[in-house]
Swiss-Prot record:
This is Phytepsin. It holds the Pfam family SapB_2. The record marks R377, A378, G421, E422 as: Cleavage. Glycans are attached at N399. Residues 1-27 form the signal peptide. It comes from Hordeum vulgare.
Amino acid sequence: MGTRGLALALLAAVLLLQTVLPAASEAEGLVRIALKKRPIDRNSRVATGLSGGEEQPLLSGANPLRSEEEGDIVALKNYMNAQYFGEIGVGTPPQKFTVIFDTGSSNLWVPSAKCYFSIACYLHSRYKAGASSTYKKNGKPAAIQYGTGSIAGYFSEDSVTVGDLVVKDQEFIEATKEPGITFLVAKFDGILGLGFKEISVGKAVPVWYKMIEQGLVSDPVFSFWLNRHVDEGEGGEIIFGGMDPKHYVGEHTYVPVTQKGYWQFDMGDVLVGGKSTGFCAGGCAAIADSGTSLLAGPTAIITEINEKIGAAGVVSQECKTIVSQYGQQILDLLLAETQPKKICSQVGLCTFDGTRGVSAGIRSVVDDEPVKSNGLRADPMCSACEMAVVWMQNQLAQNKTQDLILDYVNQLCNRLPSPMGESAVDCGSLGSMPDIEFTIGGKKFALKPEEYILKVGEGAAAQCISGFTAMDIPPPRGPLWILGDVFMGPYHTVFDYGKLRIGFAKAA
C-alpha cells in the first residue's frame, strides 16, 4: 500500500471511529452510574394496617417517618420503600456493593465482615478490610439513627470506585450492627450520601467532596434521571460532572440552596386541583431527597390532598373535639383578624404562640447525645388546633360560609394520614383525581395522578397507595417538604454544588 493509500485508510478509520464513539466534549468529565429500579414490594413496604373507620389519637403511634426524639431529618428517613440503587466498589481490588445514592444524608456506609450478630449483614455484601491493599485503619466509632432502623460501627479509609472514578483515602463507616427489619429486607447493601458535609456523621468528608478535591469531575455538578416508566431493568442514571440533555425537556428552573446540610430551597404555594391550599403561600422550606421514595409534607396539607383524592384515612377524635368545642371560637378569631399563629394559644390549646414548645432539635445526628423533645405527639390537641386554623383560614379565603367551613373541617378529621405512613386509594379512580402543583422558582410543577399514585402488585391483587405521606418538622427548621422520588421521577433534578443551586426540568 502506498503512502496515499495508507493516508486514506487512516482517514477512513478516523471517520468510522467518529461515528461510533461519542465526541470528547460530550463524554469528558461525565461519569454515569446506571440505577436499577425495583417495584414497591408488598412484603417490604410499610402497610397501613388500619381501616378508615378506626379512631386514632392524632399523630400518635408508630409513624415510620418520625423518630422518638423528633430529631434530625436523617433520623426521620424511611428506606423501607427504596426503589433506586446503583453499584460502587470499595477497596483494591474493588469489592462490589449496591447502594442508595442519597442526597438526604452525607455518609457512606457498607456492612463490615466484622458484623457478626446482625442477620442483615449475612444477607448482603460485606467489606473485608484484609482483602484490600489500600485499606487504612481509622477505628473512630460511628452510629446513625434512621426512622426505620439504625446502623453502628466504626470508620475506616479506603479507595472507593464510582463508575470509572477512583476516590482515594475515603472515610466510610464499616457497619458492625444493623438491628431491625429495615436492612434485613433491604435490596441494597449500604448508602452513599450526597448531602453537604455539615450533616456528615463524625465530620467525615463526603464522597462527592472528595471527587471535587481530587479533580475527578470537570464540573461540581451531579444530576438524577429516574426512569418511572419501567418496573424493572433500566431504572435511570446518576451523572457526576454534569447532565445529559437526553434526560430532560426544555430548560431547568434553578433555585438557590438556602441552608447547607440538605439540598434545601424555598418553595411557594401548593395547589390541589388548581386551588391554593394556602399553607405555603408565604413560602415553605423543601429539600430534594433521592433517598426518600415518597413525597412528605405537613399533615395539614397531606390531609387535604387525601380528601381530594379519596385516600383512606383514620379518624382523629382530637380533631373532631376541636371542631365541636372550639370551631366557632377559632372562626370568630380569624374573622377578627387575630394573627393565626396566636389563635391556638389564645383558646388555651397550645403552650406558646402557635408553637408546641418544641426544642429546635432538628440537627445532625453526629456525636452528641440525642435531643429530647416533648414533640408533636406529646400535645395532639395543639396539633389538631393548628391544623384546623390552617384549614379554616384557607376556606375563609375562598369565601365559604361558616357552616360549610365547619362541615368541611369535620370531614377532614376523617381523612388524617395513617400513623403507619401510607394511605390506600381506589385504583379505578385515577381519572377523577386532581393534579397537585408545587411552586418552585415562580413556576408550577404539576404531578398527575399516575405520577403520585403508586401501584403495588399486579392484576386483581393490585393495590394503589398515595405517594404523599405526612411528616411534621417543627420550627425553626419546619414546616418542611421532602420531595422524594415521587417528585424527582417526573422532574430531572440537577444538584449544582459550584453555584449552590438546584434545578428541575421535565424528565424525558
